[in-house]
């Protein structure tokens, strides 16, 4: 497409009234099923005055911002910058409204694909990043999950590449998970419809030979996971110097999953003039360091920095005892969410769905093959996915568990309880993963049990509820979990089950979010104070589940009923019991490897446990057992308290021992009580100041693990320091808030990592280390061997880093030799896209008794003339010998001469 056509977009579009369209969608690449209905007032560009023209169904919808958007001064400034940029570079862009897709200077076919997707207006992250990306700048984009980040980098990518060019890969998109890679690949295919751009997806779990074939076609765009892409790059020794555009999608997740070495290795093999984009929901310090090293003068674009979770999200936290977590889960599903049980018809339909193939590509291939064979193929009724802004089912719920063993255990438990359940974990087969996800999205199942691999990347636009079976150790993981609900302006609930060991992590979450914990006793005390101070009719305050972390327990009577149900299921099903034991072992390892909570939260958790933290939750209204509890409290506060040793009074020595013990503990208890009362008074007076006070009183604290000054110094538009204190040298008397928040955003806090970071080794200048040989006895070899010789083998890459030797196993060389292909090269012309075999085989020998005797005879004669060895026929000698033949003949002649040219006996 020529440049003139690209510039003449705005003039060729029939724009509609901006009042006919709603606000912009916040989904980043989901399929919208909404119809684009043309307005009745819309007319053709030059209608005749006599007749009233019909609305044009092919007209492009209005893409400008609504009146409600763009009221902020920052948005107006950004829109003016965008408009001025495109007016200077595109004369026809003056007709397009500022902030619309048309004003970005996108070509006509891209705008048409946007219309097919149902997008009407760009989201804020798209309005701010697309102009910068099209300028060629390196961008670091920060926005919440579901804000449209995928389209923000896919649209400029297609605009820049435009059409197919032979020579090598030009764009690489790195995703942390297989699901996110497939979802991004789907968006790339949809937005590039109408072009000849070739794109492929490379994910783990697929055949290496298939990936070899894909890479040999030298596509324009590669959507991949880092592990598989680096494996193919090292195995094939693939040249990436043609890459112009690289995207790190969900970059913080890439670092969490341990892809830092792969990313650094890939960066070293890319050209220096590439354009790099980094999109993330949060920005920990390790990611800032990576951006400094891998990006050139990057521009930081931040949205929603002040809020970490949606303001439409309501949260409830339920306390549990050691063996009552499953009963709490069953109670939440049955009584709180009102989850319906599955009928026999639904279960039968679910079993039939397991038989069908969800992968559309494989279905198309099977259809073509069976159509060629003339076979009839039974076709299932195709279920249509709901629109992206509609719930899969009214009770759609995701249950997050810590390990894959918990996934199997909880899935089996809920299915035996009668619920329709799907499940996904990291090592699940790719086809089974698609099948389970499809069943949930269609609405055949209401519950999806997953590990943290589904916190991102799984294509579920809107959810009703999220349940945390266990509270995660990192507050950042919690944010990504609950980010699956309350999206696009919809309300949602997040329920979390918390025990005593997880309470410190809840306090860390309180500090991280800046939202205080609300106990039932605290709320009742507040109500009593307001009731005493009110003069007229008293209206109790409404509990705000959005701004407070409301903590409490499930009603005890109902919980005991569900506990009996759980024990009955456990007693009657041996498989659930086995899965529970396996999950318990996995949970021990999980607790051993998770990062510890902060010391401040550990201290505060003891105080909260003592202050009736497990009272009935405010969500369930008035406590019916309150009178019984009050009676028990009266018994506890009686004057004469006797222990079991003093009841009968038979042994006077025990009675004397208990009295002496009371006298010893009395002053300690009195001092502890006075200290508690003093701390409570000081807190009310505002005299104390600690980490929690700094967090809860701070204004504009973003909580992303990196200070504002550090972000401004690392990226563009750095401001001057506003304080006389230099943060590099100033030492406070208490640990600052960033310490807690950095711990929540850190990847690992193990001693090995901290010790490695603190190591100061002067001998490691050029990676030469003195390896200390540790010998051990090998039973098989019967001798002492070096213990390091049994470790995993590595190879040194071009960047100097160690890569597993399995990455270069020679599989590609074998695959290439079998097909007689040349090594990969970026300068070859691959316009024909076919590989012609050059193998020559001897033809069949002619048979006199067959009709094709003369034909085969001619083939044999032709093969002999061309030098092919045919059995029973002598190949004609070549008239001109090659240099190798001359050399061999000369050597043979010298050998014969040395052997035979001896003096004869007659001369003696």
UniProtKB/Swiss-Prot annotation:
<feature type="compositionally biased region" description="Basic and acidic residues">
    <location>
        <begin position="844"/>
        <end position="854"/>
    </location>
</feature>
<comment type="function">
    <text>ATP-binding RNA helicase involved in the biogenesis of 60S ribosomal subunits and is required for the normal formation of 25S and 5.8S rRNAs.</text>
</comment>
<dbReference type="GO" id="GO:0042802">
    <property type="term" value="F:identical protein binding"/>
</dbReference>
<dbReference type="InterPro" id="IPR000629">
    <property type="entry name" value="RNA-helicase_DEAD-box_CS"/>
</dbReference>
<feature type="compositionally biased region" description="Basic residues">
    <location>
        <begin position="373"/>
        <end position="382"/>
    </location>
</feature>
<feature type="short sequence motif" description="Q motif">
    <location>
        <begin position="99"/>
        <end position="127"/>
    </location>
</feature>
<keyword id="KW-0694">RNA-binding</keyword>
<dbReference type="GO" id="GO:0016887">
    <property type="term" value="F:ATP hydrolysis activity"/>
</dbReference>
<keyword id="KW-0347">Helicase</keyword>
<comment type="similarity">
    <text>Belongs to the DEAD box helicase family. DDX54/DBP10 subfamily.</text>
</comment>
<dbReference type="InterPro" id="IPR014001">
    <property type="entry name" value="Helicase_ATP-bd"/>
</dbReference>
<keyword id="KW-0539">Nucleus</keyword>
<dbReference type="InterPro" id="IPR001650">
    <property type="entry name" value="Helicase_C-like"/>
</dbReference>
<dbReference type="InterPro" id="IPR050079">
    <property type="entry name" value="DEAD_box_RNA_helicase"/>
</dbReference>
<dbReference type="InterPro" id="IPR033517">
    <property type="entry name" value="DDX54/DBP10_DEAD-box_helicase"/>
</dbReference>
<dbReference type="InterPro" id="IPR012541">
    <property type="entry name" value="DBP10_C"/>
</dbReference>
<dbReference type="Pfam" id="PF00271">
    <property type="entry name" value="Helicase_C"/>
</dbReference>
<keyword id="KW-0698">rRNA processing</keyword>
<feature type="binding site">
    <location>
        <begin position="143"/>
        <end position="150"/>
    </location>
    <ligand>
        <name>ATP</name>
    </ligand>
</feature>
<dbReference type="GO" id="GO:1902626">
    <property type="term" value="P:assembly of large subunit precursor of preribosome"/>
</dbReference>
<dbReference type="GO" id="GO:0005730">
    <property type="term" value="C:nucleolus"/>
</dbReference>
<dbReference type="GO" id="GO:0003724">
    <property type="term" value="F:RNA helicase activity"/>
</dbReference>
<keyword id="KW-0067">ATP-binding</keyword>
<dbReference type="GO" id="GO:0003723">
    <property type="term" value="F:RNA binding"/>
</dbReference>
<dbReference type="InterPro" id="IPR014014">
    <property type="entry name" value="RNA_helicase_DEAD_Q_motif"/>
</dbReference>
<feature type="region of interest" description="Disordered">
    <location>
        <begin position="352"/>
        <end position="389"/>
    </location>
</feature>
<dbReference type="GO" id="GO:0005524">
    <property type="term" value="F:ATP binding"/>
</dbReference>
<feature type="short sequence motif" description="DEAD box">
    <location>
        <begin position="249"/>
        <end position="252"/>
    </location>
</feature>
<feature type="compositionally biased region" description="Acidic residues">
    <location>
        <begin position="66"/>
        <end position="79"/>
    </location>
</feature>
<feature type="domain" description="Helicase ATP-binding">
    <location>
        <begin position="130"/>
        <end position="301"/>
    </location>
</feature>
<feature type="compositionally biased region" description="Acidic residues">
    <location>
        <begin position="17"/>
        <end position="43"/>
    </location>
</feature>
<keyword id="KW-0690">Ribosome biogenesis</keyword>
<keyword id="KW-0547">Nucleotide-binding</keyword>
<dbReference type="InterPro" id="IPR027417">
    <property type="entry name" value="P-loop_NTPase"/>
</dbReference>
<dbReference type="GO" id="GO:0030687">
    <property type="term" value="C:preribosome, large subunit precursor"/>
</dbReference>
<dbReference type="InterPro" id="IPR011545">
    <property type="entry name" value="DEAD/DEAH_box_helicase_dom"/>
</dbReference>
<feature type="region of interest" description="Disordered">
    <location>
        <begin position="821"/>
        <end position="885"/>
    </location>
</feature>
<feature type="domain" description="Helicase C-terminal">
    <location>
        <begin position="373"/>
        <end position="533"/>
    </location>
</feature>
<dbReference type="GO" id="GO:0000463">
    <property type="term" value="P:maturation of LSU-rRNA from tricistronic rRNA transcript (SSU-rRNA, 5.8S rRNA, LSU-rRNA)"/>
</dbReference>
<dbReference type="Pfam" id="PF00270">
    <property type="entry name" value="DEAD"/>
</dbReference>
<dbReference type="Pfam" id="PF08147">
    <property type="entry name" value="DBP10CT"/>
</dbReference>
<dbReference type="GO" id="GO:0000466">
    <property type="term" value="P:maturation of 5.8S rRNA from tricistronic rRNA transcript (SSU-rRNA, 5.8S rRNA, LSU-rRNA)"/>
</dbReference>
């Amino acid at each position: 497409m020529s440049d003139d056509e690209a510039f003449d977009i705005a003039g060729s579009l029939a724009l509609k009234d901006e009042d006919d369209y709603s606000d912009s969608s916040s989904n980043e690449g989901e399929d919208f099923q909404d119809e684009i209905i043309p307005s009745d007032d819309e007319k053709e560009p030059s209608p005749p005055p006599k007749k009233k023209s019909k609305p044009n169904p092919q007209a492009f919808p209005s893409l400008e911002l609504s009146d409600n958007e763009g009221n902020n001064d920052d948005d107006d400034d950004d829109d003016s910058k965008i408009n001025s940029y495109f007016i200077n570079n595109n004369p026809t862009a003056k007709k397009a409204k500022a902030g619309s897709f048309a004003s970005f200077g996108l070509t006509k076919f891209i705008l048409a694909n946007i219309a097919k997707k149902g997008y009407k207006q760009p989201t804020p992250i798209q309005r701010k990043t697309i102009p910068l990306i099209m300028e060629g700048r390196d961008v670091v984009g920060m926005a919440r999950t579901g804000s449209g980040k995928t389209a923000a980098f896919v649209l400029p990518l297609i605009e820049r590449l435009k059409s197919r060019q032979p020579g090598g890969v030009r764009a690489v998109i790195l995703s942390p998970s297989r699901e996110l890679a497939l979802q991004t690949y789907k968006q790339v295919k949809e937005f590039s419809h109408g072009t000849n751009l070739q794109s492929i997806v490379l994910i783990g779990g697929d055949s290496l030979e298939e990936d070899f074939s894909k890479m040999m076609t030298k596509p324009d765009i590669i959507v991949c996971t880092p592990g598989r892409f680096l494996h193919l790059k090292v195995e094939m020794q693939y040249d990436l110097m043609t890459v112009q555009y690289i995207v790190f999608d969900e970059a913080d997740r890439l670092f969490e999953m341990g892809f830092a070495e792969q990313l650094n290795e890939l960066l070293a093999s890319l050209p220096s003039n590439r354009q790099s984009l980094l999109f993330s929901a949060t920005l920990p310090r390790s990611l800032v360091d990576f951006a400094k090293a891998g990006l050139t003068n990057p521009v930081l674009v931040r949205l929603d920095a002040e809020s970490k979770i949606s303001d439409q999200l309501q949260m409830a936290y339920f306390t549990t005892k050691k063996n009552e977590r499953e009963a709490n889960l069953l109670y939440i599903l049955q009584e709180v969410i009102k989850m319906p049980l599955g009928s026999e018809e639904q279960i039968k339909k679910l079993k039939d769905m397991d038989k069908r193939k969800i992968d559309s590509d494989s279905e198309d291939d099977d259809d073509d093959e069976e159509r060629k064979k003339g076979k009839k193929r039974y076709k299932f009724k195709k279920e249509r996915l709901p629109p992206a802004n509609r719930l899969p089912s009214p009770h759609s719920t995701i249950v997050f568990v810590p390990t894959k063993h918990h996934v199997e255990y909880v899935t089996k438990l809920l299915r035996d309880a009668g619920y329709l359940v799907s499940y996904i974990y990291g090592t699940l087969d790719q086809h089974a993963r698609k099948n389970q996800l499809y069943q949930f999205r269609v609405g055949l199942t209401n519950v999806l049990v997953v590990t943290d691999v589904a916190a991102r990347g799984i294509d579920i636009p809107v959810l009703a509820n999220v349940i945390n079976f266990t509270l995660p150790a990192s507050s950042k993981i919690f944010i990504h979990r609950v980010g699956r609900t309350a999206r696009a302006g919809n309300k949602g609930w997040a329920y979390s089950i918390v025990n005593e060991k997880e309470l410190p992590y809840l306090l860390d979450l309180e500090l991280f979010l800046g939202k205080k914990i609300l106990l039932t006793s605290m709320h009742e005390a507040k109500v009593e104070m307001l009731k005493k101070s009110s003069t007229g009719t008293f209206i109790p305050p409404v509990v705000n589940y959005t701004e407070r972390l409301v903590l409490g327990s499930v009603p005890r009577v109902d919980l005991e009923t569900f506990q009996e149900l759980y024990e009955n299921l456990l007693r009657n099903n041996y498989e659930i019991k086995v899965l529970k034991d396996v999950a318990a072992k996995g949970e021990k390892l999980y607790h051993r490897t998770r990062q510890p909570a902060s010391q401040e939260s550990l201290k505060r958790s003891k105080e909260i446990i003592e202050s009736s933290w497990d009272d009935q939750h405010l969500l369930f209204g008035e406590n019916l057992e309150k009178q019984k509890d009050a009676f028990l409290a009266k018994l506890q506060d009686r004057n004469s308290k006797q222990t079991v040793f003093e009841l009968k009074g038979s042994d006077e020595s025990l009675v004397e021992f208990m009295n002496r013990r009371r006298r010893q503990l009395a002053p300690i208890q009195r001092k502890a009580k006075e200290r508690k009362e003093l701390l409570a008074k000081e807190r009310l007076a505002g005299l104390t100041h600690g980490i929690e006070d700094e967090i809860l009183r701070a204004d504009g604290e973003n909580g992303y693990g990196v200070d504002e000054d550090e972000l401004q110094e690392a990226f563009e538009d750095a401001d001057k320091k506003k304080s006389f204190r230099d943060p590099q040298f100033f030492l406070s008397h208490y640990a600052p808030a960033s310490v807690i928040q950095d711990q929540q955003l850190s990847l690992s806090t193990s001693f090995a990592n901290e010790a490695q970071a603190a190591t100061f080794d002067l001998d490691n200048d050029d990676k030469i280390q003195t390896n200390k040989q540790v010998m051990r006895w090998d039973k098989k070899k019967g001798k002492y061997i070096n213990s390091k010789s049994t470790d995993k083998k590595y190879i040194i890459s071009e960047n100097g880093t160690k890569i597993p030797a399995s990455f270069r196993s020679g599989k590609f060389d074998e695959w290439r030799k079998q097909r007689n292909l040349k090594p990969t090269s970026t300068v070859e012309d691959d316009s024909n896209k076919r590989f012609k075999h050059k193998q020559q085989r001897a033809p069949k020998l002619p048979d006199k008794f067959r009709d094709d005797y003369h034909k085969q005879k001619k083939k044999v004669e032709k093969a002999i003339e061309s030098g092919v060895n045919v059995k029973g026929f002598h190949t004609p000698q070549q008239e001109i010998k090659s240099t190798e033949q001359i050399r061999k003949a000369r050597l043979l002649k010298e050998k014969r001469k040395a052997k035979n040219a001896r003096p004869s006996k007659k001369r003696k």
